[in-house]
UniProtKB/Swiss-Prot annotation:
It comes from Sphingopyxis alaskensis (strain DSM 13593 / LMG 18877 / RB2256) (Sphingomonas alaskensis). The keyword Ribosomal protein does not apply. It catalyses: octanoyl-[ACP] + L-lysyl-[protein] = N(6)-octanoyl-L-lysyl-[protein] + holo-[ACP] + H(+). The keyword Cytoplasm applies. Keywords: Acyltransferase, Cytoplasm, Transferase. This is Octanoyltransferase. The lineage of its organism: Bacteria, Pseudomonadati, Pseudomonadota, Alphaproteobacteria, Sphingomonadales.
Amino acid sequence: MPSLPVPQWIVSPGLTDYAAALADMESRAAAIHADEAGERIWLLEHPPLYTAGTSADPAELLDPRFPVYDAGRGGRYTYHGPGQRVGYVQLDLTRRGRDVRAYVHALEGWVIDALALLGVKARRAEGRIGIWTDDVRGREAKIGAIGVRVKRWVTLHGFSLNVAPDLTHFTGIVPCGIAEYPVTSLAALGKATGFSEVDAALARTLPAFLDKLRPSD
């Protein structure tokens, strides 16, 4: 089968309004489904906010100090804000295997591979979605979140990676419903890494991520 076109790669400067990003994702998903637009990888940064997934428990919103949005994705509460790289991945799974679990597994692997290029040994954790590593005290800590939605086999949302956010902002929620593990970042691990380096690592590991998604016959 011929190879698929490489998804459009967009990096938005500054802070992107969350509601506007949601509307843009929905519009693009409809266009991809209608074969009126190609797939897209959209890298951006949001102002401080909390998002609630479809499994969010209101008791886990401890201090709504920032705006709270219903995201429509799977999962529970998470935080987005300055210093965090957000990746919205919009792929057509009718062309890439129609396997949501394989997609989520590959998405986790993409972020893990990118972190390896940045000198961070990250991993999956059994029963806990997301990207995990050891913090400077040797504790298992979350450095990245995964939250996806699939609509008519087109993916929406994606991942967030903590580059240098204010980690105290996570204390307003129980991140992803997991209270017993801390949150960390590249900066907290002593990695003086900016968005340009993170984006370059993601770009280098993108082909391997796409290769894991088997094109449908």
